[in-house]
Each structure stands twice: as C-alpha cells, then as structure tokens.
Amino acid sequence: MRKILVTNALPYANGDLHLGHMLGYIQSDIWVRFQKLQGNQCIFVCGSDTHGTPIMLKAKSLGITPEELVTKYSNRHLQDFTDFEINFDNYHSTHNSLNKEIVEDIYNKLNNKNLISKKAIAQAYDPEAKMFLPDRFVKGTCPKCKAEDQYGDSCEVCGATYDPTELINPRSVISGQSPIQKNSEHFFFDLPALEKNIKDWIESNTLLQPEVANKLAEWFEQGLQSWDISRDAPYFGFAIPGTNEQKFFYVWLDAPMGYIASFKDYCNRNEIDFDDFWGDNSESELYHFIGKDIIYFHALFWPAILSSTGYKTPTSVFANGFLTVNGKKMSKSRGTFIQARTYLDNLEPSYLRYYFASRLTSRIDDIDLNLEEFVTKSNSDIVGKVVNIASRCAGFIYKKFDATLSGEIFDPELESEFSKNHDAITQAFEKREFAHAVRLIMALADKANQFIDYHKPWQLAKEEGQEQKVHQVCSQGINMFKVLIAYLKPIIPSIVAEAERFLNIQFISWADAPKFLINHKIDKFKPLATRIEKEKVDKILEDTKKMLENEQAPQSKKEEPKLDITAECTFDDFMKVDLRIAKITEASHVEGADKLLKLILDLGGVTKQVFAGIKSAYKPEDLIGKHTVMVANLAPRKMKFGMSEGMVLAAGDGKGIYILEPHEGAQPGMRVK
C-alpha cells in the first residue's frame, strides 16, 4: 500500500469559482479516487487562500471585515466543491492560528539560517489611495515581451517575473493613476543560495512534466533572484514578527503553508503521524496539483523553502492548462464565463466531469469546452453507450429470471477482452492520461453494444426455447456494464453510486473491476442518466449573461454635489491673510461654553490664545502636541471667555469637524503660501 498526500491549489476567497477553476479540481479528484480504489492510503487536502490586499479592499468596498468576506466565500467554495463531487478529506483556511504558527516557525528557521535579509527598495505607491501597491495592483506593459495589461509581478503571456518598477507605463489598479516610487524596507528570501537544493530536487523528480522542466531551465538561465516576502501595511495577513505590524508576510509565502496547516489539522483530528507523510525522511508520496500560472511559486520557491526547513519536498508538481469555451477565452459578454454554481443550477456534475476527463492528459494543454461537443459526447457516451447497455438487458433479467444473473459466461473471449484492458486502463489513470482511459473504456462500451445488437435479446425472447440464451446474453450485457461502470467510478461517482444500487454491489477494489458476477441478484433498473437538452446549455449562457448585466447595472444616480463657493477674491486680497504653522501646546475646556476649546498655540517663539469651536470633535488631551494651521494676522476678538488672537483652520460638512494638519517636517511659525 502506497502512502500518498495530495494537495490542490487553494482557491482565493474573494470571489466565486468558475468552470476554469473546476478543471484542475476535477482532475485531482479523479486521480485521488482512483488511488483510493487501488487500496492506497491517499489523503486529499485543500483550503481557502484568504490573505492579501485584494481581499482587504473588496471587504472595505462591501462595508464588511476581511474575515467576514473570506468566511462567506470559503463556505460558497466548499459547497461548490461538494456539489461537483470533489471529495476533499480536509478543507481548511490560511487564516487561523495553526497556519500562523507554521508560517512563523518556517520564517524563523529561514532567518536562523541567514536566508532572510532586509533592504530598502523603491515601491510603487499610489498617492491618491495613500498606500503602497502590491504587485497585482500595478498593471502595465511587460518589460520582457511587451505584452500590454500585465500584472506587476509576472506576465501571463511569456511567464516572465519582474519587479513592479520594471513595468512599462505602469498604472494603479485602484485609482488608475501612475504610481510614484517610494522607499520602504522589505524582507527578502535568498533563493539563489538554494539553487543547488532546487536542482537536486528537479534531478530526482522523474515525474516532472517536460513543460515544467523546460520552464525551470529557462528561469535558471535567466538567474534566480532573491524573493520579496513582505508587504507594507495596510495589509490583511500575518504580521512579520518584530515589525510592530508594519510589515506583513506576502500572501505567496503563507498560502502554500496552508497545505501544511490543512494536513496537520487533518492529522490532529485523525491521530495520523504528520512526519510519516511530510517529515524530511518520509517515504510517502507528496503531489501538488496546480494551474500552470503558479508553477513559479510551486516549483522554485516551495521546494527551496521545504528543503531548508526540515520538510519533505514534493514527489512532483502537476500543472494543468487553462479552460477556453468554444475555442475562445472565457468571456462574460458572450456568457461563457460560467460560474460553477450557474452550471450546477442547470446540469448534473457528472457530465462536465466526464467531458473534462475525456480531454485531460498529463500534458499542460489548455482544454476547450466546446458546448456543442459537450452535449453530443455526454449524450452519446454516458447515456447512449454505457447506461444504454443496462437499460437494454436489465428488464429481461428482472422479469424473466428472478432478477438473477446467469451462472455461466456466454462469451468467455469477450469477457477476457474486458479483463485484458484492465492493466492499460489502470496505467492511463495512474499517469493522469484520463483521455486515453476514457477512449479505452468507450471502445469496450462499443464492443458491448455490438454484442447486444448482434444477439438481439428482444427478438430471442419471442422465440420458443431461447430462454437460456436470452438469460446468458443479457447477463453478459449486465456484466460488461458492471465492468465499464467500475472503470468510470473515479470520473462519474454519483452515476456509479446509482449503478451500484441497481447491481447490488459496491465497487471498493479496483482489482475487482473486470470480474463478472455469477448467479448474482440485481435490483430493478431505473434510469441512471438523462440526455442533455440543448435548452439547458442555452440557459446556462443566458444566466451567465444576466449575471453580467446585474454586475454592470448602473447604480442609482446620486445627485452631483454642489459647492457653495463664496464670491471671488483677488490674489492681493488672499495674500493679506497670513497663514502660519502652529503647534498646540495647551488645550482645555472652556467653562460655560458648549462648543469651544481654549488653545494655546506656539508660532515659533510667539504664543497666541485661540478659542476654537471644535469641542464636539476633539478631546483637549488629544490635541496637545499636534501641529495645525492658523490665521495669524486676524484682528483679536474679545469674547466673554477671554481674548481670541486668531483662528484655527478646520473643515466640516455639518456632520464632523476636522482641523488641518500639515505633513511631517512643517515647523511652528512657517508661513503657508
């Protein structure tokens, strides 16, 4: 028995899953189900990727906390996975104390090995949003291949990685403004120091996809760079120890560690030895299933980090391609940017699972969901070929032969052919050549249907003395159906579950898949799958378009704000007003006054007393030491509380009062011009 741990890329918890996501999860789920049927101990873990600026900003725009946002989408993701029959053994999250503990432990180990350094770097800063911009919040032209509209950390066209500062014509995704450069101290992981570790891992990895190996060779040729593992506040994530929550771990540092946290959580709840699977000396197998867009993180950084912190490195990393629909990139306007839930609201998951399996290979090829072919293949293969075998034979067995299969095999040669294909189908599943496995299974289905067409049990049943042959022919038909459905169990588990009920058997061992049933009692046959009507697919497209229309529906038009600007003054009139920086040295309540605070202001050696109507907005003790702006040459005004020798500048909208504060560096007495 092999011990296997499988992880799938963690979905980002700031939006709903679409069919492009489901391609990778269905691929890994099929492989895991196959391994479990083989009798291997195969544990399948995943979880939500929950940190980063996109989540923080989306939560802010919705008026909720980041925690509320990730909980909402984590729950929705898990429901989508469950309904698509993705059977994780554990589904966790990166935002919890266990993952925080793991992240900090790995960081400390790297730091103790002098693999972490600090240096000041020029960062993209959005002056309008007043925040540093993460890589993915800067877009521009790729400095390598010149592709437009690429992210600040990597190009989706050529796969190159770079710093946001290298982008051509960069712009802020938040405000659309050109970011400025601003220095900030960041933490770096010394990836070049571990180049040998990575190359040793690659050389020992016999299962690495050729496309991945070629890409790694290209990156080595370009030269590895130290990896920036920090981000500036504000940021939703784990603070780097010792930074007073001003620096946070980059999401791509703590996200892969979510694999470890999810598996460790599973181990804690099931009394499994974590080190037996992920310890440095473990002989178990570890596989990461990912999309091709995140190879860089999983095949460079991840093995480097694991190899230097006492963890087992992956046995291999398996990447899948992207999904296109009708030969084109998924599009909201065409209705082909289909969410998982939209599909599930209209069709059963088995059809899409089967279609994806019929197209998936071990290569990193993009898969096209041709909707016309999807309908044809589902109806032809699942309904017309496989299920049809049982529907053509079951009635005779149930009604005429006490629902019991024959004790003899009518065509041993054909039975042998079904059995001989077992090894080839097994190898195809093992190597993730699902399309080849499906072709082999459907070739057998064709032979089964040809057998039934040739012997025509519906005609034999009308002939006197042919009862035994009818029994044997239909029993062989049911047995061939049984073999086919057993082979398809990793792909269409819910249909197979219904078939198991009909056959009065549960397929728990892959080795038993080709075995025929002798003198075995079956149940009454009920339809296992229905044909897909084109209208169902059309409705999926219509629902997707409606969703887009709702997203783009104009918000209720707000009345444009009107500024009640006073009459113009000349420049000379304005220059008569002497505005000065003032430091508030004292602040106190004014007895008998509901709105006033008494302020003593230092103008750089000159002291002035001012009564300001800001009591509703500020506590006196909070103002002491602050700098503000005052009108220094306003004629003194005698009030019943004392003499007011100027005016402090403040803004207000009737709902709040906000005194003006100059930027750091302004000194008392400086004139404001």
Curated annotation (Swiss-Prot):
A motif ('KMSKS' region) lies at residues 329-333. A motif ('HIGH' region) lies at residues 11-21. It is found in: Cytoplasm. Its main location: cytoplasm. Its cofactor is Zn(2+). Gene3D superfamilies: HUPs, Isoleucyl-tRNA Synthetase, Domain 1, Methionyl-tRNA synthetase, Zn-domain, Nucleic acid-binding proteins. The keyword RNA-binding applies. Zn(2+) binds at C142, C145, C155, C158. GO terms for biological process: methionyl-tRNA aminoacylation. GO terms for cellular component: cytosol. Pfam families: tRNA-synt_1g, tRNA_bind. InterPro entries: aa-tRNA-synth_I_CS, Anticodon_Met, Met-tRNA-synth_bsu_C, Met-tRNA_ligase_1, Met-tRNA_synth, Methionyl/Leucyl_tRNA_Synth, MetRS_core, MetRS_Zn. ATP binds at K332. It comes from the Bacteria. It catalyses: tRNA(Met) + L-methionine + ATP = L-methionyl-tRNA(Met) + AMP + diphosphate. Residues 573-673 form the tRNA-binding domain. Keywords: Aminoacyl-tRNA synthetase, ATP-binding, Cytoplasm, Ligase, Metal-binding, Nucleotide-binding, Protein biosynthesis, RNA-binding, tRNA-binding, Zinc. One of its GO terms (molecular function) is ATP binding. Its EC number is 6.1.1.10. PROSITE patterns: AA_TRNA_LIGASE_I, TRBD. Homodimer. Is required not only for elongation of protein synthesis but also for the initiation of all mRNA translation through initiator tRNA(fMet) aminoacylation. This is Methionine--tRNA ligase. The gene is metG.
